[in-house]
Regions:
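A cross-family glycoside hydrolase active-site/sugar-binding cleft signature
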Residues: 105-106, 137-141, 176-180, 199, ...
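C-terminal edge strands of extracellular/lumenal beta-sandwich accessory domains
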Residues: 299, 304, 309, 397-399, ...
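Hydrolase catalytic cores
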Residues: 107, 244-337
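Gly/Ser-rich catalytic serine loop of serine hydrolases
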Residues: 69-83, 156, 257-273
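Extracellular S/T/G-rich loop segment that most often corresponds to the catalytic His/Ser-adjacent loop
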Residues: 188-280
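Secreted peptidase-domain scaffold signal
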Residues: 324-442, 501-510
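Subtilisin-like serine protease catalytic core
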Residues: 4-12, 17-117, 130-135, 145-148, ...
Length: 510
């Protein structure tokens, strides 16, 4: 029997979610709805004969596309394993959010359907729980060679990719997508703009901290270049946003045997279920009417900014200058974040292999819990906001405390591409046969500037990608003093008013 690795992936050697399960936090995702879409679905004990034992996976509901699940049909051990990572209530192999409500839809065999049916499944899951589903897990995808477009590329405009970006905005749900890996083959919808694409890590010295070799997220070189070039995003926009544990994860087979599995399929659900933990906390704050807390805490882009901004990059020495980060994350080439082009080039917000770093659910809680702060008054050293910025204008967040020299600042700005549904029958829903229209992405930039500066000429650090739906700053403060964060609406492509989420983490110079 293999060593039980799942607790390692949700404990402090992994995403450190187990700490949140226990007092004083007591967060397990209670009453929070999350979703799952893949080819098959988890089995439901008492309904499906193939589930011969009662796994501790309490599914809320299972579906076939946009209808009820067929008994003993589409039951798939892969889907069951992914569900287990999210919601297993088993004592031996607990999931990340054992209290969450999971809605799972099987889109069926690719032979009988394709992207339209997968879109239908995603829409159906997004509408469950009275339309209140906070995150949906995609641990599968569509190969480019099956895409009906001539000369199909990863440009964000495959039907399924457009569907995900449309649904993210329409249903306000965070899509978490397993990154492309190995020989490639499942790149659609990893070219989405509005979700989180996840690479997977393996353990190094007992800690999940190294991007594994099977991830396809390296810059293409050598003999495989032609194939791989088609399998990474067109242009400079990067696909991977975040990394999470995915190597040798212990899960249950349908018959109750424990097996070890690897891949981005098992990294993504760590992220999806972490949303449920944060959202249970958010609900608690709303119910007790806490100050600096609104329903904006439920927004998908707020979750995206919070998860990406709180990721681990470089282990803190104990002096807090690196924001208390718990591990140094390495790429396949053994380079860390400070050696990456993303660190050196303001036009590149994401490392091509690890995105902003490694998922840390406990740090995400520390990022989220200080609450929402508006630019109208000075803001605390850690927090987040959801607001709009007008074309050619900017929003300034003045940090209340002066920052410590040599300390790092982490800032993440997230916003969405606009995709419209070409709704032929005017029923406000996607139907097979309908299509979407890409209305593009507005260009926003992010700066850290001295508090008394009016322009961005003196910016200390910036993130100014022309193509990404995310800007991310991780940089050291050169001199102690007061600073402000500037969100700049650089260039209009669709609407003049752009909603955004912003998360920040700084070190005050006490």
């Amino acid at each position: 029997m293999p060593v039980l690795a799942s607790p390692a992936s949700i404990g402090e050697t992994g995403i450190d979610a187990q700490k949140l399960h226990e007092p004083p936090y007591n967060l397990i995702g209670r009453k929070i709805a999350i979703g799952q879409v893949e080819i098959g679905r988890p089995g439901q004990f008492g309904i499906d004969k193939s589930v011969s034992w009662n796994p501790a996976i309490a599914l809320e509901r299972v579906f076939f596309r946009d209808g009820p699940a067929k008994v003993n049909t589409d039951v798939d051990s892969h889907a069951g394993m992914v569900a287990g990572v999210m919601i297993s209530g088993d004592k031996t192999l607990p999931g990340v959010a054992p209290g969450a409500r999971l809605y799972s839809s099987a889109s069926g065999s690719p032979v009988e359907g394709g992207q339209p049916e997968e879109c239908l499944s995603a829409q159906h899951v997004a509408l469950q729980n009275g339309g209140d589903v906070r995150a949906i897990n995609f641990s599968f995808g569509e190969p480019l060679q099956r895409d009906p477009r001539p000369e199909a590329t990863l440009d964000g405009n495959a039907l399924l990719t457009q569907c995900i970006d449309w649904s993210a905005r329409t249903h306000d749900v965070l899509y978490v997508i397993a990154g492309n890996q190995g020989g490639g083959g499942i790149p659609i919808p990893t070219d989405n703009f509005n979700g989180i694409n996840v690479a997977y890590t393996t353990q190094r010295d007992g800690v999940f901290s190294k991007v594994d070799f099977a991830n396809l997220s390296a810059l293409p070189v050598g003999i495989g270049r032609r194939l791989i070039t088609r399998e990474i995003n067109v242009g400079p926009r990067r696909s991977i946003n975040l990394s999470a544990p995915g190597s040798k994860i212990a899960v249950y087979e349908l018959d109750g045997k424990i097996v070890e599995v690897s891949g981005t399929s098992f990294a993504a659900p760590h992220v999806t279920a972490s949303v449920a933990l944060l959202q249970e906390f958010g609900n608690r704050q709303l119910q007790s009417k806490q100050p600096n807390w609104t329903t904006d805490s439920r927004r998908n882009q707020v979750m995206r900014a919070v998860l990406l901004n709180s990721a681990d990059k470089i282990k803190d020495n104990g002096d807090g200058l690196r924001l208390g980060m718990t591990r140094t994350v390495l790429g396949k080439d053994n380079l860390n974040w400070l050696e990456s082009d993303a660190y050196k080039d303001p036009k590149i917000p994401l490392d091509i292999q690890m995105g902003t770093g490694h998922l840390n659910a406990f740090r995400a809680y520390e990022q989220f819990s200080p609450g929402q702060w508006s630019p109208e008054a000075a803001v605390p050293s850690v927090g987040w906001d959801y607001r709009t910025v007008e074309a050619k204008a900017s929003q300034d967040y003045v940090l209340e405390q002066p920052l410590k020299a040599g300390s790092f600042v982490s800032l993440t700005l997230a916003w969405e591409r606009v995709v419209d549904l070409d709704d032929k029958n005017k029923n406000n829903a996607f139907d097979v046969g309908e299509s979407f229209r890409d209305r593009g992405l507005n260009n926003l930039d992010l700066y850290l500037v001295p508090a008394d500066d009016n322009g961005t000429t003196k910016s200390v650090c910036s993130s100014v990608s022309e193509v990404d739906s995310i800007e991310h700053v991780f940089c050291p403060v050169p001199t102690a003093g007061r600073y402000k964060i500037r969100v700049q609406y650089r260039q209009q492509v669709n609407e003049a008013s752009q909603p955004y989420a912003l998360a920040w983490w700084t070190v005050p110079a006490q």
